[in-house]
């Protein structure tokens, strides 16, 4: 309802660019505090905000480490913290998981889900369509600067010409009976059957979890 040119309208917006630049000699807490002061925060309210945001993005344990020792995923998360420091109503994220390993990518998506649960509007720009499908409610497809498709994830991904049935513990005999029923129908076509596949990311995360369960103290 306000002009985007008005300076005060930008107070409602947080932004994380694809490749944010931070002062590597500052710690995580100092970085968030720096941006908080730029937004007019000070004193106890600033300290409380810094603690809250570092906890939110999972960097409370790294609050006193310099950014020069942060991984790419940690830098992206500290970037999300600075984008949230003024408690915006709209958060704009440009390729937030670009160059981030699968574990760090999952952490960032969990943060986005957390923010959605708090009622914040998150505008996400990404070429990683699998991640978009996981976290977004509505999607717009842009090609050469034009919006060529828009809708909910379910609307855009649903294939209305097909029906999908997911069975567990189905015996070979049951599968054969189902195929015979399809043949008898005369209109339906049995396209394929087999075991569902997991994404490589889910395989990686599952393997990592299993390894951690077997090695609870890897440094010992």
Please place each PLM-identified region on the residue numbering.
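ABC transporter nucleotide-binding domains
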Residues: 1-124, 129-143, 148-149
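Short, charged/small-residue-rich alpha-helical element at the C-terminal edge
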Residues: 153-220
């Amino acid at each position: 309802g306000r002009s985007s040119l008005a300076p005060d309208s930008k107070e409602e917006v947080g932004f994380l660019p694809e490749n944010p630049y931070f002062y590597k000699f500052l710690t995580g807490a100092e970085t968030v505090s720096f941006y908080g002061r730029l937004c007019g925060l000070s004193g106890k309210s600033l300290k409380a905000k810094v603690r809250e945001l570092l906890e939110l993005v999972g960097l409370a344990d790294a609050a006193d480490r310099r950014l020069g020792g942060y991984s790419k995923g940690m830098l992206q998360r500290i970037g999300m913290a600075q984008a949230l420091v003024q408690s915006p109503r709209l958060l704009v994220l440009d390729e937030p998981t670009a160059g981030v390993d699968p574990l760090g990518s999952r952490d960032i998506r969990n943060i986005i889900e957390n923010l959605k649960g708090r009622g914040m509007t998150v505008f996400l720009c990404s070429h990683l369509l699998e991640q978009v499908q996981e976290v977004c409610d509505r999607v717009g497809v842009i090609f050469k600067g034009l919006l060529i498709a828009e809708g909910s994830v379910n609307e855009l991904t649903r294939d209305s010409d097909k029906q999908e049935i997911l069975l567990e513990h189905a015996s070979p005999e049951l599968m054969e009976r189902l195929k015979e029923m399809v043949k008898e129908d005369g209109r339906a076509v049995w396209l394929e059957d087999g075991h569902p596949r997991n994404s490589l990311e889910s395989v990686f995360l599952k393997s990592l979890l299993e390894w951690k369960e077997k090695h609870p103290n890897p440094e010992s």
